[in-house]
Curated annotation (Swiss-Prot):
This is Elongation factor Ts. It comes from Borrelia turicatae (strain 91E135). GO terms for cellular component: cytoplasm. Its main location: cytoplasm. Residues 79-82 are annotated as: Involved in Mg(2+) ion dislocation from EF-Tu. The lineage of its organism: Bacteria, Pseudomonadati, Spirochaetota, Spirochaetia, Spirochaetales.
Length: 278
């Protein structure tokens, strides 16, 4: 049976598959349109499985927030061109919305199949790398942020506010948004110095001490220098101790205290997440 170019184009328009693959699928099922769509899915999943071993170092971060939850999702792919593809972006936005609304932090079988179908259509190794879903309490204010046109960085920050009547306060909401921007810019690893593993602190202290051994300085002087270096380093990776993004004369902790005093309610960061491509 001869397959016309019009039939191939119709199948291509519906499925997004390549012209050659559409022709092969139609030939294989004798021109039956519905069977050809099924055949393409089978072909696509097989080819997607073959591509799954290839490096996927590019990608895009997606985020969604509603009244109950906030989420971040990283979908990886092979090229930044695909990360800008409209089908890729639409799929990612839809998937993170589904995950947040369901409260699930893992994919179901249907979603896994949809990932494979997308990979088959785009012809790259595409997979979900990370998912973060966090519940939002009634006294918590959340802001999320995606950086740049390619959304290679995504963050959310969650503030606990003692007086829920202040949740709509402009200065509070501005603070929350600024803190989201801050997390995107400085990528803190911990909320506070107290959250940092004691073994890590000990390793850093030993490293700084070793660096100073050949300095010829006295033990007391070395101890003081090491203490200063350690304090500086820990402050650089702990969010509350970092210089505030819009006023580095204040730490993040001091900026929160400033706004807290101005609106007469206690504010504290209870959660944040930073997610990036690569």
């Amino acid at each position: 049976m001869s397959i016309s170019p019009q039939e191939v184009k119709k199948l291509r328009d519906v499925t997004g598959a390549g012209f050659g693959d559409c022709k092969k699928a139609l030939d294989a099922v004798g021109g039956d349109f519905e069977l050809a769509k099924k055949k393409l899915r089978e072909m696509g999943i097989a080819s997607a499985d073959k591509r799954s071993g290839r490096d996927a170092k590019e990608g895009r971060v997606f985020s969604y927030v509603n009244k109950e939850r906030v989420g971040l999702l990283l979908i990886s792919c092979e090229t930044d061109f695909v990360a800008m593809n409209s089908d890729f972006v639409t799929f990612g936005n839809s998937l993170i919305k589904q995950l947040v609304e369901s409260g699930k932090d893992s994919l179901d079988k249907q979603q896994e199949l949809e990932i494979k179908n997308l990979a088959a259509t785009i012809k790259e190794n595409i997979h979900v790398s990370k998912i973060y879903i966090s519940n939002i309490a009634s006294n918590e204010l959340v802001k999320n942020y995606l950086h740049g046109e390619q959304s290679k960085i995504g963050v959310f920050i969650k503030l606990k506010v003692d007086d829920v009547l202040k949740m709509e306060d402009e200065s509070l909401n501005n603070l929350a948004m600024d803190l989201a921007l801050h997390v995107a810019a400085f990528a803190p690893l911990y909320l506070s110095v107290g959250d940092i593993c004691s073994n890590y602190i000990k390793e850093q202290e030993e490293m700084f001490t070793k660096q100073m051994e050949a300095s010829g300085k006295s033990e007391a002087v070395i101890k003081g220098i090491v203490s200063g270096k350690l304090k500086k380093h820990l402050g650089e990776i702990a969010l509350l101790e970092q210089g505030f993004v819009k006023d580095d004369k204040l730490t993040v902790k001091e900026k929160i205290e400033e706004i807290s005093k101005s609106i007469l309610t206690k504010i504290e960061i209870v959660d944040f997440k930073y997610l990036s491509v690569g």
